[in-house]
Amino acid sequence: MTAEDFLTGQILLIDKPLHWTSFQAVNKMKWALKSKLGLKKIKIGHAGTLDPLASGLLLVCTGKATKQIAELQGQAKEYTGTFYIGATTPSFDLETEIDESFLTSHITEQLIYKTVEQFLGEIDQKPPIFSAIKKDGKRLYEHARAGETVEIAFRKTTIYEFEITRIDLPEVNFRIKCSKGTYIRSIANDFGKAMDSGSHLTALRRTKIGDYDVANAIDVLAFVDPLENAK
C-alpha cells in the first residue's frame, strides 16, 4: 500500500502481542507510517482497547477510516481464554497476586456447564477496580493503587455465546461472544462466585470483532517491516 492508500483510509487487522499496550501497537504503526512513508501527518486509532495481558485482534484505522471507529467499537467481540478456579486476585487476572484461595472439591463438570447458563443473555456486571473507568475524576485503577475504596456501579452487558472448550481443573478454557464494554475479567471473577468458589483470568485472546477475524490479522512488526519498500 502507498502513502495515499493510508491517507484515504484503511482498516488494518493487527494481532496484538502479549504484554504490549494497544497504545504501543498503534504508536509503533504511526511512527512507521510517518518516518518510512514520509507522512508528516496521519490520523490513526484503534477500535477497542486490549489489556496488556491479552493478545489478539486489534482493528487499527488510518486516515478517513478513523471515522468508522465508533461504529466498529460497537460490534460484538469474541474471546477465548482460561479461568483458574479456586483462587482470586484483586485485578481479576494475573496483574496482581492471589489474595484468597477457595475450596474446589465440590466443583464438577456438570456444575461448570450449569453455571454457564447463568451468564447467557443480558447480565448486570460490575467492572474490575483495576480498570480505566473514571470515578470521582480518577481512573478506577488509580483508586485501587492508592488503596482507596470506591463504589462501582453495575453495568448492563450481553453475553451472546458462552462455550466451555476444556476442563482440566483448576483450569477451564472458554469461548465468549459478547457486547461492547464487557469485562471478561469480571466474568472470570463472577463465574467462581457463582460456583461458591473463586476464579481469575489467566489467559485471554480476542479472536473476532464483528466479522473481522484474527485469523486474517498480522503482527505489528509484519506490518512495519514491508513499509521500508513501500515508498
Q: Which residues does each PLM region occupy?
A:
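Catalytic/RNA-binding core of pseudouridine synthases
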Residues: M1-K231
